[in-house]
UniProtKB/Swiss-Prot annotation:
Organism encoding this protein: Maedi visna virus (strain KV1772)
GO biological process: viral budding via host ESCRT complex; viral translational frameshifting
The record's note on its domains: Late-budding domains (L domains) are short sequence motifs essential for viral particle budding. They recruit proteins of the host ESCRT machinery (Endosomal Sorting Complex Required for Transport) or ESCRT-associated proteins. Nucleocapsid protein p14 contains one L domain: a PTAP/PSAP motif, which interacts with the UEV domain of TSG101.
High-level lineage: Viruses, Riboviria, Pararnavirae, Artverviricota, Revtraviricetes
GO MF term list: nucleic acid binding; zinc ion binding
Region Disordered, annotated ranges: 420-442
UniProt record similarity statement: Belongs to the Ovine/caprine lentivirus group gag polyprotein family.
GO CC list: viral capsid
Protein name (Swiss-Prot/TrEMBL): Gag polyprotein
Keywords: Capsid protein, Host-virus interaction, Metal-binding, Repeat, Viral budding, Viral budding via the host ESCRT complexes, Viral release from host cell, Virion, Zinc, Zinc-finger
Length: 442
């Protein structure tokens, strides 16, 4: 079937690159990827099911139409597995057509379902607004900003599913990765400046990278001030960044240029930090080696940071942060013990003072002693429990010697059976008391 379809339609030449990208998507984590035959099977099957769409080119609009029609079909019991495979393969092709790169088939289905939910919410909202504004179709709708007939706009917060999708991409690929940049550029075109910066601040990522991104944004703002002197029709940095504006004010038409500039600044900052991360000598890649002293590591780190083309406050932040996060495990533990909760804010000099003995013979002996020290419930039981008789820790009440009087000698501190003045009589049931002592010197 695949060979025949390829001959008839020449392998869907308009989808050549899309199919090539789809073949990189895995069926599951650690499993095999989709093949060209899988894609051709799905496309040919769809053409067979929906013959009225067969002659139309495979655009994203046609794919969404097919997707909606497939949802309305109910397969037979014996065909449910093939039908699920058809939907999953189509979801992967749709993601590739939109430029997305999901790692697995399940991720592709999740992306399409998420976008479908956004589309349904948008349509539901449009039906309500259309009752008040019948000519709404003549105006362009910008989600979550909606142009209304009267000239104003309404604002809606970023959908949670979109935020979660961006969080997932940031955790899997990194905050400055191309995948995150592509996703942010796709969704943020209709966000206010406040939305863009707030979402970026709440994304998971390296603290040093976030500080570098903020530094790049400050550089873009300074460049804007130099190149655009204040004037009646000139946007200010505060307007571009959404400072001092409500969400309703930021969503108005006069702020469209400001939103576009803010998004461009963020994209430029992400790309700059990404290029910096892959450049040789990147400070974030300078980490302490197992056999390297902390002083030598700090010397390499400071040299790399000083060579970076960033401002002095960012250099100071990188020195304070990376001197802890990029240190070895032993040095981090030593800094935690010495500096406590202020370890992240401590200066480099304080951290060097705390780690001066790491790697020495005395430090190694200390680690060995800690490793050999008894732990667990058995080792803590005698230390934590207190005697109910005398109130002192280290023994139980039945083991307490305080207040005990020997009935043989009349002295305190031991019982009659343990009395040393008592003569041994015959073979006792318990035998003679054994007193620990060192072996004799031979």
């Amino acid at each position: 079937m695949a060979k025949q379809g390829s001959k008839e339609k020449k392998g869907y030449p308009e989808l050549k690159e899309v199919i090539k990208a789809t073949c990189k998507i895995r069926v599951g984590p650690g499993k095999e990827t989709l093949t060209e035959g899988n894609c051709l099977w799905a496309l040919k099957t769809i053409d067979f099911i929906f013959e009225d769409l067969k002659t139309e080119p495979w655009t994203i609009t046609k794919m969404y139409t097919v997707w909606d029609r497939l949802k309305g079909l109910t397969p037979e019991e014996t065909s449910k597995r093939e039908f699920a495979s058809l939907q999953a393969t189509l979801a992967c092709i749709m993601c590739s057509q939109m430029g997305m790169k999901p790692e697995t088939v399940q991720a592709a289905k999740g992306i399409i379902s998420m976008k479908e939910g956004l589309h349904e919410n948008k349509e539901a909202k449009g039906e309500k607004v259309e009752q008040l504004y019948p000519n709404l179709e003549k105006h362009r709708e910008v989600y979550p900003i909606v142009n209304l007939q009267a000239g104003g706009r309404s604002w809606k917060a970023v959908e949670s599913v979109v935020f979660q999708q961006l969080q997932t991409v940031a955790m899997q690929h990194g905050l400055v990765s191309e995948d995150f940049e592509r996703q942010l550029a796709y969704y943020a075109t209709t966000w206010t400046s406040k939305d863009i910066l707030e979402v970026l601040a709440m994304m998971p990522g390296n603290r040093a990278q976030k500080e570098l991104i903020q530094g790049k944004l400050n550089e873009e703002a300074e460049r804007w001030v130099r190149q655009n002197p204040p004037g009646p029709n000139v946007l200010t940095v505060d307007q571009i960044m959404g400072v001092g504006q409500t969400n309703q004010q930021a969503s108005q038409a006069n702020m469209d240029q400001a939103r576009q500039i803010c998004l461009q600044w963020v994209i430029t900052a992400l790309r700059s930090v990404r290029h910096m991360s892959h450049r040789p000598g990147n400070p974030m890649l300078v980490k302490q080696k197992n056999t390297e002293s902390y002083e030598d590591f700090i010397a390499r780190l400071l040299e790399a940071i000083d060579a970076e083309p960033v401002t002095d406050p960012i250099k100071t932040y990188l020195k304070v942060t990376l001197s802890y996060t990029n240190a070895s495990t032993d040095c981090q533990k030593q800094m935690d013990r010495t500096l406590g909760t202020r370890v992240q804010q401590a200066t480099v000099e304080e951290k060097m003072q705390a780690c001066r003995d790491v790697g020495s013979e005395g430090f190694k002996m200390q680690l060995l002693a800690q490793a050999l020290r008894p732990q667990g419930k058995a080792g803590q039981k005698g230390v934590n429990q207190k005697c109910y008789n005398c109130g002192k820790p280290g023994h139980l009440a039945r083991q307490c010697r305080q207040g005990i009087i020997c009935h043989h000698c009349g002295k305190r501190g031991h019982m009659q059976k343990d009395c040393r003045q008592k003569k041994q009589q015959g073979n006792n049931r318990r035998g003679p008391r054994v007193v620990p002592s060192a072996p004799p010197m031979l």
